[in-house]
């Protein structure tokens, strides 16, 4: 077997008709987790429905339909392999809650793949002012997805024309530069998702195409296909050296064992014997054991979904949205208030001080008041445009002071990224996204269990 491949998460963004499903479907189909039986079943259904052209989008449509009906699909279906990586496709936009998922994300993307439709008229529509493409790319950048790959799709529809390709590369470079990416670090790859051309094997339809190139700290990296571009993602650094932050997804009471909180380690490590504090309540206790997939662990590291058993704490004292940390190393605390840069996406009216929508931050889901609108900024550069604006509307970026309606635990994005980004939800949609700059923490002490006191004396 050799060493486990590194896991990377990618998010696929782009305009509705850019061919995201077909392209993703193709990678999963050729390199991925869909077993032959499932594919044969899909192919048979496709043929019966007269969708003989089947082509990979059908795979993805099936998966999506199942997911939207709330059938949890075997997530293995959304995975594929490159020589270096296990790749998980987090979520393709178009899905209603895409923005929310990307922020509270069960997993942060290491790289975004922007799919641009090269067809005549299509490219222009996808990248126009109101385009979703702009919003998705801006979101990815704002939320700290620092690596980008651009795939220029549907090259078959323009007969692999070189000048059309160059024109799109030029326009797209300007576009991603405005969002904040440096085009020199971004591979541009011409593909046809429908025909599977230049996805896994180099195309033979474009004698002019010499391959993509990107700059990295280690020097220039070159390749031809989309799969090679994904394989050339720089390996993500997982934050094991930071203090522990583990937002709880659920808390179970298990007969004979006791209270078992469950969640994903975002930063740091959790080990048996550790004395942990839960914020915002401040309850401090000892971790008896840590397990994942019913196996005992010596330690849980970032990315692990773990369950852990705690002593002398009842299910009533801790809940989903609480954050677990090491009581001796920068323990998490309740936030009295916090300042954040907010980008208003789609709010029909004006937002003024006093507005109290629900914020989704890690696993917490709590109403927070826009207490003060401190300053309005340029979305791209962050430069200040005006002090104390009276209101904000769609498209604005601003620094805002928030006050939670009940105790919650959040962190500055620079300290603990997964706990420092949030979605603002109202009217059943994401109206804004935010990145937390600073937090005023509460110093109220909470309950310390006997187990914690004993462990502390050891």
Swiss-Prot record:
PTM annotation (N6-methyllysine): residues: 3, 30, 316, 390
Keyword GTP-binding: yes
Region (G5): 192-194
Binding site for GTP: 14-21, 91-95, 153-156
Modification type N6,N6,N6-trimethyllysine: residues: 79
Compartments where located: Cytoplasm
Any single GO CC term annotated in Swiss-Prot or TrEMBL for this entry: cytoplasm
InterPro entries (alphabetical): EFTu-like_2, G_TR_CS, GTP-eEF1A_C, P-loop_NTPase, T_Tr_GTP-bd_dom, TRAFAC_GTPase_members, Transl_B-barrel_sf, Transl_elong_EF1A/Init_IF2_C
GO biological process, one term: regulation of translation
UniProt cross-references to CDD domains, sorted A to Z: EF1_alpha, EF1_alpha_II, EF1_alpha_III
Positions of the UniProt region annotated as G3: 91-94
Entry's transmembrane regions: none
N,N,N-trimethylglycine modifications at: 2
N6,N6-dimethyllysine: modified positions: 3, 316
Region ranges (G1): 14-21
Region (G2): 70-74
Domain tr-type G: 5-240
Region described as G4: 153-156
A GO molecular function held by the record: GTP binding
Keywords of this entry: Cytoplasm, Elongation factor, GTP-binding, Methylation, Nucleotide-binding, Protein biosynthesis
Matching SUPFAM superfamilies: EF-Tu/eEF-1alpha/eIF2-gamma C-terminal domain (SSF50465), P-loop containing nucleoside triphosphate hydrolases (SSF52540), Translation proteins (SSF50447)
Gene3D superfamilies cross-referenced by the UniProt entry: P-loop containing nucleotide triphosphate hydrolases, Translation factors
Function, as annotated: This protein promotes the GTP-dependent binding of aminoacyl-tRNA to the A-site of ribosomes during protein biosynthesis.
Family designation: Belongs to the TRAFAC class translation factor GTPase superfamily. Classic translation factor GTPase family. EF-Tu/EF-1A subfamily.
Name of the protein this chain belongs to: Elongation factor 1-alpha
Gene encoding the protein: TEF
